[in-house]
Structures are given as structure tokens and as C-alpha cells.
């Protein structure tokens, strides 16, 4: 039975265009809800198994994880959290044609989606900044240790926790989305008060614009650096050139991850900003659900990029499941390879020792690639 708006305990906190109706009733047709439910089910299954597989393969070599790999695993944790903690709520609600978990469930769902989404974006920001420093500042990689990666993880989760908990303590709130079967940050508070505008603007800047700017800046600098150094690398022997090619490939994978995330979330951000500072009731309900569904698919992209785009990674995963040699897992590299960078840094001081170091490093990688036919195209 539909709820009467007078029975809602948080009626005064609702967006103005939801106060005269049941905010948890779906505004879509039954057919549209069923399509959305099946779509989210497929996305959730693929994301759960994909990111779970990444974590499983990582756990098999946890003693060998490097700092950048730790950050990539954290990204998989964020994506898995979105799929396991959040998606079931919306899927069930779509099939029930209304949000069935009440205000407590609405707040929980809104918090979880914001928490893991923010954690994912900040993790990608940290990875892009890390790669920028490693490639453009040679001395950075010398002192970077595992403990620094764990400190970075603590900062990421503290940052996400701070911004996502603010609405739960009175600065902002979580509310139903216009179509009724999902909940999100209450963007409409920006139209209610000056304090609401300040809060929404702060969220947009610190949780979207600033991280996106850092990502774009970092990869723009990386592209410029790779282009300027490619001619220099061509003069080295084939082993150093191979390391350079692999480094560029892994950087492209990272860029694809960030691009996929931003492509999925930017339409949703645009609609949210329009809801906060424009005329939210001017957006058709049927249209407002599309950016939401697109954003919810972001957690599925990364495993596909890992296992399809990076063929070497996928090959070594398959070899690991068949019980091949443990060293074949060395090709499970979701981080920027630093062979060229290190060799270039040492070359300026000790050319002979640099050549020996790089050759040994690359030959070691080649020997692992031969096990299980990893790296064959």
C-alpha cells in the first residue's frame, strides 16, 4: 500500500517535487523497472565475479605485492563493495516497483554508494599521481615502499569516510531519486538554503572536480613525458625498449580505467548539478534514470580492462588456475613498470651498472613470460 505523504517522518527534508506523493513509489512503468532490474543484475554479477577474481588472484601472491598493485587491489575492493553492498537494494526495488527498504535503507544505500564511489575515484587519483611522479621524477620510485602505499590507503578511506558521513550528522542528507527505486545524496538541498549550497559545492569540488583535475593533469604530463623520451629509448638495446613499451602499455590501461570511470559518472554528475542548481523537475523521469544506470555499471569496467585489454595479465591468470609455476604470476602486473625509469636514472651516474641492472630485470621478466606462454600475441 502506498504511503501517504503525511505519514513520512522526513517530509520536510524531501525535495519539493516529492512532497505531494509517495517518494518510494516507482515513477517508471513496470516494464521499465523490469528492464532496469535485469540490467543491474547482469552488471552486478559480472562486477562481483570480475573483481572477486582480481582479489583472488592477488591473494595468491600477497607477499609479492608492490605499492601500485596494492592501490589497484583497493580499487577492486571499492568496485566489489558497490556491487555487493549496494546493487541488491536497487535490484530488489526495481522488481518490486518501489523502494522497499524505508528511510534507514535509503540512507544506508546512499551512504554505501557514495562511500565506495568516492573511494574508487580517490584511489584512481592516487594511482595517477603516483605514476606521474614515478615517470616524471626519477628519484620518487627509489624511496617508495609498501608502507607508503598502506598510509595512502588509510588517507583514501579516511577522506571517503569524512565526506560520506557528513550527511548522516546533519550536513546534508540522503534522499530518494526522482524515479523512486534508488537513493542518493540529496542534491536538492542546494535549493533549500545557503548552507545546503555550500555543502553541495564542497562535495562537487573535493569529491569530483579536484580528483578529476589531478587525474587529467597527471596523465597529460605522462603522455608528454612518454613522447619526449620515446626517441631516447630507441637508442638503447632491445631489452630496454621492450620495458619501455610495456610501461607505456600499462599506463594506457590505467588511463582506460580512469576514462571508463569518468565516462560512467560524468553524465550522472551533470544531472546532479542541474538538480542542485537548476530546475530538477524539468528533467523527464525516464531520462533521469539513464545516467544512474550508466554510473552503476562503472564497477564492471575495470576487470574487463584487466583481463581483456591487458592480454599478458589475463594469460597469466589462466596459467595460475591451471597450476602452472608460481613465477608465472609475476606477469600479474597492474602497476607501472619502472625498469626504464630506474635504468635511466642509474645510467646518468653509472652507465655500465645501469645496463647490467636493466638487462637482468628484463630477462627475468622474459623468462617468466615464457612459462605458460604469457605475453604471446
Curated annotation (Swiss-Prot):
Glycans are attached at residue 4. The chain crosses the membrane at residues 34-54, 75-95, 109-129, 151-171, 198-218, 253-273, 289-309. It is uncertain whether Cys-315 or Cys-316 is palmitoylated. Residues 1-33, 96-108, 172-197, 274-288 are extracellular. It is found in: Cell membrane. Residues 55-74, 130-150, 219-252, 310-377 are cytoplasmic. Disruption phenotype: Ultrastructure of the retina is normal. Newborn mice show normal hyaloid vessel numbers and normal vessel cellularity. Retinas show normal expression patterns of rod and cone opsins including Opn4. Decreased activated Vegfr2 in the hyaloid vessels and increased activated Akt1 at P5. Reduced levels of dopamine in the retina, however increased levels in the vitreous at P6. Reduced number of hyaloid blood vessels due to precocious regression, however no change in abundance of Vegfa or Flt1 at P8. GO terms for cellular component: cytoplasm; plasma membrane. This is Opsin-5. It comes from Mus musculus.
